[in-house]
Amino acid sequence: MNIEEADVGLAIRHAGDKIGYVHIGESHRGYLGTGNIDFAAIFDALVAIGWNDYVTFESFSTAIVDKDLSLKTAIWRNLWDDNVALARHARQFVELGLETASRKAELVKLAHLSG
């Protein structure tokens, strides 16, 4: 969606319950939150549509990925070399992002009820 859509959050909201799978990755295929993807907008949209399923994460690094695959996928940088640390970071990043989006949505709902 990042390539095809001008507003990923809006695209997620528009697709709504038609979404069956969420697959994310950073713009440079490294650690989430260190590139230029607007994950806050993505998490806000996922909360808005009631997404309550898995979020899959993908990342590549020349230190880990097979050399032939690195060439075929145009990976030329070593952005990480510890699978476990990367996976832990991704899980925490997604969980925190969804929790933050949920809290924001609740605050908006409360503001509308009291306003």
Label every model-predicted segment.
Residues 1-115:
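Histidine-acidic metal/acid-base catalytic patches
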